[in-house]
């Protein structure tokens, strides 16, 4: 046994398992004491004496999922981001609470918030057992009037950019986010244009790293993605690589992203029963952008060895509501990625990207007891992720349909 369990040990046994990095086809017995995993045993192992065991036959056990791109202040409504500045503290707190509940109900036990307002998420990251871990960036750095400027992160000029990073360090954020291009959810910004010069991006990256902080860049068009890579970012959000001809990532750019160890969150996943917001749908139709065109672009990154992680951009509109991360994993498998790679992008690799590797993301003694048990076997049918039957968040059963 990896660690001696105490008297409060509870076991979770499954016929198939994924430990965050590889499939365990013969199952697993995970022993939990309090908030921590204290043992990871073969599925056939006997449980300690007097240890209750939850065993759902035909189930698969894996680490709790991680949504690496959320906006907890967003209520998933049509005006989720537009209304942020007008929300009262009480309304914001209630939205955040509902969002966290929706995530854990879907099997998500950790989230990375990449854009709030008034530091509402960054200042309230201490969630209780039974709720997801929260990693936060605070308001993203953007140009005056730029993408998500209403979150309060506008900065310009060398001194202004340095102050912006310093402010985030003083607030104790976990990561810095910068809007390297315009975005689809902010009227008046150009999603096909870069928002900062390469020199400015390099300055912000350098300042973040001096503060010991990783930095991720929102980037849609190829020039903005290339700038982010050249500036030395640690992550890229969306990485849609818009061109006049659709979605396309030059092979050399994909190879450079992979060689640099940059994490890419392509923000896949949406509620399949909800239509895309009209203004986004209009843009996609105008540009001729379809999933059939996006699929090979993502596959090209996967084939190049890019470290892909799962994140939905949760909370920004009805189609991107909180709690649909399983759809991001399902879509990645649809591009041709292996099930293990897709699940790793929502567990161990996401934990690495979010600075949570020492806390969660793997079935390992000493890490948080963040567990997901689904009905069925995602290695034969990835849609099994849609049917969580037990969710354990830091040792607390937040969902139990056993």
Outline where the language-model segments fall.
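N-terminal metal-binding scaffold of metallo-dependent hydrolase/deaminase domains
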Residues: 1-48, 60-61, 376-381, 396-397
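C-terminal cap of metal-dependent C-N hydrolases
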Residues: 34, 346-348, 365-402
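Metal-associated gating/positioning segment near the N- to mid-region
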Residues: 59-126, 223, 231
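Histidine/acidic-residue-rich catalytic or RNA/ligand-binding cores of hydrolases
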Residues: 76-79, 186, 225-233, 250, ...
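Active-site mouth loops of central-metabolism enzymes
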Residues: 81-94, 146-163, 214-219
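Divalent metal-dependent hydrolysis catalytic cores, especially in the metallo-beta-lactamase
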Residues: 93-122, 131-142, 173-186, 213-214, ...
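Histidine/acidic residue-rich metal-binding segments in metalloenzymes
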Residues: 160-239, 243-264, 287-308, 341, ...
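His/Asp/Glu-enriched, well-ordered alpha-helical/loop segment
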Residues: 291-377
């Amino acid at each position: 046994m990896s660690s001696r369990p105490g008297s409060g040990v509870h076991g979770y046994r499954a016929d198939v398992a994924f430990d965050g990095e590889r499939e365990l086809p013969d199952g697993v017995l995970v022993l939990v004491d309090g908030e921590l995993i204290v043992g990871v045993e073969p599925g056939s192992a006997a449980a300690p004496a007097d240890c209750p065991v939850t065993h759902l036959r035909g189930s698969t056990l894996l680490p709790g999922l991680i949504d690496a791109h959320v906006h907890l202040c967003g209520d998933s409504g049509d005006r989720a981001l537009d209304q942020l500045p007008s929300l009262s503290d009480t309304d914001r707190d209630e939205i955040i609470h509902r969002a966290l509940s929706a995530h854990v109900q879907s099997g998500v036990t950790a989230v990375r918030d990449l854009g709030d307002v008034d530091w509402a998420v960054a200042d309230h990251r201490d969630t209780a057992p039974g709720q997801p871990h929260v990693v936060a960036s605070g308001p993203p750095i953007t140009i005056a009037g730029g993408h998500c400027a209403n979150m309060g992160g506008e900065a310009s000029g060398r001194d202004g950019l340095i102050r912006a990073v310093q402010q985030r360090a003083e607030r104790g954020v976990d990561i810095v986010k910068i809007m390297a291009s315009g975005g689809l959810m902010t009227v008046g910004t150009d999603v096909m244009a870069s928002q900062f010069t390469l020199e400015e991006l390099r300055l912000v990256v350098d300042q973040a790293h001096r503060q010991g902080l990783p930095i991720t860049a929102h980037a849609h068009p190829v020039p903005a993605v290339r700038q982010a890579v050249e500036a030395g970012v640690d992550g890229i959000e969306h990485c849609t690589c818009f061109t006049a001809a659709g979605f396309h990532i030059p092979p050399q750019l994909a190879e450079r992203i992979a060689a640099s160890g940059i994490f890419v969150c392509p923000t896949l996943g949406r509620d399949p029963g909800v239509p895309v917001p009209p203004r986004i749908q209009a843009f996609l139709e105008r540009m001729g952008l379809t999933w059939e065109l996006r699929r090979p672009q993502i596959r090209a990154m996967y084939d190049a060895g890019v470290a892909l992680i799962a994140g939905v951009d949760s909370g920004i509109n009805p189609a991107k509501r909180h709690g649909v991360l399983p759809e991001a994993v399902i879509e990645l498998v649809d591009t041709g990625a292996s099930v293990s790679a897709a699940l790793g992008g929502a567990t161990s690799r996401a934990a690495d990207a979010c600075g949570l590797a020492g806390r969660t993301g793997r079935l390992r003694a000493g890490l948080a007891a963040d567990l997901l048990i689904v009905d069925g076997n995602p290695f034969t049918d990835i849609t099994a992720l849609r049917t969580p039957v037990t969710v354990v968040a830091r040792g607390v059963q937040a969902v139990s349909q056993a």
